[in-house]
């Protein structure tokens, strides 16, 4: 039975890879990669985002200057048409994956709910 779940998971992976949402996201990443300015903004923003996330996860204080820096980086990122498109497509793909996760977790949620009743 569990082997069947892995087979289905691999099929889901392939379905995600071939979906129009993923293909559009992939094309948007490639467009950013080819644009030196957009790519530089993108990598700077991602690096800053990762540093702040790491601080948050370790409980380190995030300074007001860092928050301001992140807000400025976000504003610059959103002003770039390619990056704005990329972020929109990332958000759409993230929502699809979140919906899929909710669907796959439904049996456990129902089990836990029935146990609590």
From Swiss-Prot:
One Pfam family linked to the record: Com_YlbF
Source taxon at top rank: Bacteria
Family: Belongs to the UPF0342 family.
Name recorded for this polypeptide: UPF0342 protein GWCH70_0629
Native source species: Geobacillus sp. (strain WCH70)
